[in-house]
Amino acid sequence: NNFDFQEMLSEMLGELNGSHTGARYSYRSGFNMGTLGALYDNEYKGDGLKIKEVLKGGPLYMTDPEIKAGDIIESIDGVDIKKDTDRHSLLKNKGGDKVFITVKKGSGKAKGMYIEPGFTDYTQLYDRWVEQREQMVEKLSGGRIGYVHVEGMDSESFRRVYSKLLGKYRTCE
């Protein structure tokens, strides 16, 4: 089976004593879970999904950058979101497909739009995490220390770190 093959391949790669080598079996769930690229206010008790934060680069941000924290997603594909609605069921198998959502802005005005949910928020959450760490280090050090996170041992990650060290953080300790 695939799991045993993964284990055998990992053992073989280990015998090569090669750094950063590996193999893993990826489990398939049979369905995809669409994501709108937002974090929701889990303390909110009313109808709809109250947005706590819109993730930069995510589907909501890319579709309408005017959507902000405090706005409420009232419906997805014509299904009103009540306080007891399972929000995950509304986006099941919707990743990559266009859906129609209705968003009530902080002003009380509702706005409808088509949006293409993503398959994951991993990249946006990672970028958010790095940005938060950069801001925290800058604040705590008074701008003396720069923060870089090495995402991977590849050329793109090296270039990103190198660019920050010689750019944004060139005057830092």
Describe the function of each predicted region.
Residues 70:
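Conserved catalytic motifs of ABC-family nucleotide-binding domains
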Residues 3-8, 16:
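Extended, domain-scale alpha-helical bundle/helix-rich regions
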Residues 26, 50-53, 59, 74, ...:
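Cleft-lining beta-strand/loop regions that shape enzyme active-site pockets
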Residues 4, 62-65, 82-83:
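Short, surface-exposed helix-loop/turn micro-motifs enriched in polar/charged residues
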Residues 11, 15-56, 61, 116, ...:
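PDZ/PDZ-like peptide-tail recognition elements
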